[in-house]
Amino acid sequence: MSTTTQRGAASGESEQTPLAVPLPPLVELQGLSVQFGNRKILLSLTASLRGRSIGLLGPNGAGKSTLINTLLGFYKPSAGSARVFGYDIGTEVRQIRGLVGYMPENDAFISKMSAVSFVQMMGELSGLPPSMALERAHEALFYVGLAEARYRQLGTYSLGMKQLAKLAQAIVHGPKLLILDEPTNGLDPSARQRMIRMIKDIRDGKEMRIVLCSHLLRDVEDTCDEVLILKRGRIAHYANLDEERRANKRFLELETYGANGDFTEAIEKLGCECAVTANRMKMILADGVETRDIFRLAAERQVRIRRMNFRRDSLEDIFLKAMEG
C-alpha cells in the first residue's frame, strides 16, 4: 500500500506528501513485577510506550533504576513480561542489548585510560571490529566536544567532561535505543544546557530513540514527548506531553467587563463549555473554535476582555498531582 498521496493531477503535476506513520512500540510492559526476596520493587506495571523520547520520573526508591535494569535483562521479573523493540526480555535479552547504548548515572571509568581508548574499548565490547571502534570513538568524542581532550586520562577530567565521555561511549556503536540515567546530574547551568542540546539533537536525528531517567523535571520536560511517572513501584501517571501541550491551548480563563448572559450563551452555541463567576469566565474551546472567535463575540456584545490566559499545566503540575494519589 502506498504511503503517499498525489495532488495536482489536473495540471499534470504530481506532489507526493508522506503520510504520518506511528512509531512502533519501544517498550511494552504487561503486568511486570520484580521482587527481591520478600521486598516488592515493581508492582504489575502495564504500559505501551511509543515516543521518540520517553522520560522516567519518580522520587528516590520509586523503581526507575530497577525498571531499566529489568529491561536490560539484569533482573528477572517475578511476574508478567516486557518487550523492547518487540524482543522479550526473558528470552531475547542478547538482541535487546545489541540495540542499546547505556549512559549510567555512576562513573565506570578506568581512570588511567585515555578517553579515546576507553570509548574504543566500549565500542569493541558492543561488537565493533577494533579499527571501526577506534574510528567511531574519535567521531563520538568529536561530537560531544571532547576532541582536544580525547587523549587525556579520564582521571584528569572534570565532572562535566566525564558526563560527556559517558555519552560518547553510549553512542559509539550507533544504537537504536539510548538509555540515559541522570545525564545532567551535578552539571553547572552551562554544562547542563550543552547536554540538553545534544540530547535534543540525537532525538531529532531520528536514528536513536531515548529513555531518559531523571529526578529533574525540567530535563524531562525539555527533551521528552512521553513521561511515565513511578511511585512506590507502581505507575502513578502516564502523560503524552505533546498532547498535554495541545490540550493546554484549549483551556481559557477570561477577565471581562460588561459580560452578560447573552455573551455566555453565544460562546456556548459555538460548542464551548463555560463556567462564570463574577467577572471571570473559564471555558474549554470546542474543536475549530479559535480565540479570535471569542474576541469577535465580545466586540459584537460590547464586552471588554481585560485579560485572557491559557491554562499552563507544567510537568511539575502533572508530577505533583501524581504524587498526591
What residue ranges belong to the model's regions?
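ABC transporter nucleotide-binding domain
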Residues: I196-L285
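Conserved ABC transporter NBD signature motif
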Residues: G80-T91, Q95-I96
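Conserved ABC ATPase "signature" region
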Residues: Q120, E124, S131-A149
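Walker A (P-loop) phosphate-binding loop of ABC-type ATPase nucleotide-binding domains
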Residues: P59-G63
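Helix-to-loop junction immediately C-terminal to a conserved catalytic motif
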Residues: L72
